[in-house]
Amino acid sequence: MTEFASRRTLVVRRFLRNRAAVASLAALLLLFVSAYALPPLLPYSYDDLDFNALLQPPGTKHWLGTNALGQDLLAQTLRGMQKSMLIGVCVAVISTGIAATVGAISGYFGGWRDRTLMWVVDLLLVVPSFILIAIVTPRTKNSANIMFLVLLLAGFGWMISSRMVRGMTMSLREREFIRAARYMGVSSRRIIVGHVVPNVASILIIDAALNVAAAILAETGLSFLGFGIQPPDVSLGTLIADGTASATAFPWVFLFPASILVLILVCANLTGDGLRDALDPASRSLRRGVR
């Protein structure tokens, strides 16, 4: 327990020394909290219409301006952040869990389990997932359809990570502590949960952080193209799509949601890089050597 605590402390110290990663994580948390805490404080809801303020630029009444329907862009952007960030987090958690389960089982047991699971991985990797999701996904307007979208995105987002977990598990299964646990009669399930998964936790944490950005980008792309979340509900993708046509004449309709999307993606990637450097310092040295 002491060794685990000391390693955890060392990882936290490494991460805190990375100012860009710390600032990015703080920005992500601030955006997530703001998306849920600010809407009740605003005078307008995301679906309220102000016919006296159509396509108004940012001002004291509407801080980020309004769109062609007179809807407040600040309220709409916050609503879009709620949907996009929630979908991103859910997809990252589910896909990372699938990757950990499949990779650990495949790498630990080997044999027919390994061949079967890797065949499934190879099959899913060649499937044009984005096109398939766009075809299968209905226009999501309620929570059940949004959950279906989350499951689809997660179902096509775990394969590469599972291969990495499998490789690490194959190297771990012949280590002395794993062999000792087997000789003591510890069940395979307890070995995987208690010994294998904690030793591959670093790659899972990094994968989860980076998957948030990938899932948000995928959901935004689907909504932008007319799939996924659609009006009357909003996501960052639908807001960007609505503002594209008038981006030159009324730039605020496009720029604010697009800027928020870029900020979320950059912060998520910087946070993932910071976690990778903290958990695996050798990777940072290797990247510097390549440069």
From Swiss-Prot:
Protein localization: Cell inner membrane
Residue intervals of the ABC transmembrane type-1 domain: 81-272
Membrane-spanning segments: 22-42, 85-105, 116-136, 142-162, 209-229, 247-267
One example GO MF annotation: peptidoglycan peptide transmembrane transporter activity
Gene Ontology biological process terms, A to Z: protein transport
Major localization listed first in the record, in broad terms: membrane
Cellular component, GO annotation: plasma membrane
Top-level taxon in the UniProt lineage: Bacteria
Function according to Swiss-Prot or TrEMBL: Part of the ABC transporter complex OppABCD involved in the uptake of oligopeptides. Responsible for the translocation of the substrate across the membrane. Glutathione (GSH) uptake by mycobacteria through the OppABCD system contributes to the depletion of the GSH pool in infected macrophages, which impairs the ability of the macrophage to detoxify methylglyoxal (MG) and contributes to enhanced production of inflammatory cytokines.
Record-stated family: Belongs to the binding-protein-dependent transport system permease family. OppBC subfamily.
Record note on quaternary structure: The complex is composed of an ATP-binding protein (OppD), two transmembrane proteins (OppB and OppC) and a solute-binding protein (OppA).
Annotated protein name in UniProt: Oligopeptide transport system permease protein OppC
